[in-house]
Amino acid sequence: MSRVLIIESSARQQDSVSRQLTQTFIQQWQAAHPGDSITVRDLARNPVPHLDANLLGGWMKPAEQRSAAEQDSLQRSNELTEELLAADVLVMAAPMYNFAIPSTLKAWLDHVLRAGVTFKYTDTGPQGLLTGKRAYVLTARGGIYAGSTADHQEPYLRQVMGFIGIHDVEFIHAEGLNLGGDFHEKGLNQANAKLAQVA
């Protein structure tokens, strides 16, 4: 049995395309892997705090030297990190906001990219510790950006996933959603066709 962790980050709810893609993924994954467990963390409904001095301080101190506020911040970060460590498959649903990812998703990443936990420093440079995991990134984009210099979403997420040792990453883009005509339908159809091959 595998554990699947899904990270939702769209600020929209019912009309969110990235959430639609997530639901399609869940339906197809459950049909193909009925014994797997799926955990969904919704960063829009339950936002993760941005990094602050308490969390940064807590990371740098031994347990006995942490203040109550530092310990509280660290406990939240530990919960997020433990979810990721326990997962075999990571799914990130990310609409493109201003050529990049939602700030809620960036905040989550800031909590789980942790030295000594998800990566470590070595004499030859950083080494990711989450090898053996798979990741899928489901994106929704108003325009068509794949392969262009305006895409600061896929390159960034590939970089951070690789940094923590997740190199098996597949991106599924629903593009051109706001371009009018039949672009919206084509973008969804292409994304759904790729999703059908995932499970």
Curated annotation (Swiss-Prot):
Please give the cofactor(s) recorded in the UniProt entry for this protein: FMN
InterPro entries, alphabetized: Flavodoxin_fold (IPR003680), Flavoprotein-like_sf (IPR029039), FMN-dep_NADH:Q_OxRdtase_AzoR1 (IPR050104), NADH:quinone_OxRdtase_FMN_depd (IPR023048)
Report the EC number(s), separated by commas if there are several.
1.6.5.-, 1.7.1.17
Does the record's keyword annotation contain Flavoprotein? yes
Binding site residues for FMN: 10, 16-18, 96-99
Q: Does the UniProt entry include the keyword Oxidoreductase? A: yes
Cofactor detail note: Binds 1 FMN per subunit.
Q: What reactions does this protein catalyze?
A: 2 a quinone + NADH + H(+) = 2 a 1,4-benzosemiquinone + NAD(+); N,N-dimethyl-1,4-phenylenediamine + anthranilate + 2 NAD(+) = 2-(4-dimethylaminophenyl)diazenylbenzoate + 2 NADH + 2 H(+)
User: What are the entry keywords?
Assistant: Flavoprotein, FMN, NAD, Oxidoreductase
Q: Which GO terms describe its molecular function?
A: electron transfer activity; FMN binding; oxidoreductase activity, acting on NAD(P)H as acceptor; oxidoreductase activity, acting on NAD(P)H, quinone or similar compound as acceptor
**Subunit record text:** Homodimer.
The role this protein plays is: Quinone reductase that provides resistance to thiol-specific stress caused by electrophilic quinones. Also exhibits azoreductase activity. Catalyzes the reductive cleavage of the azo bond in aromatic azo compounds to the corresponding amines.
Family according to the record: Belongs to the azoreductase type 1 family.
**Which protein are we looking at?**
FMN-dependent NADH:quinone oxidoreductase 2
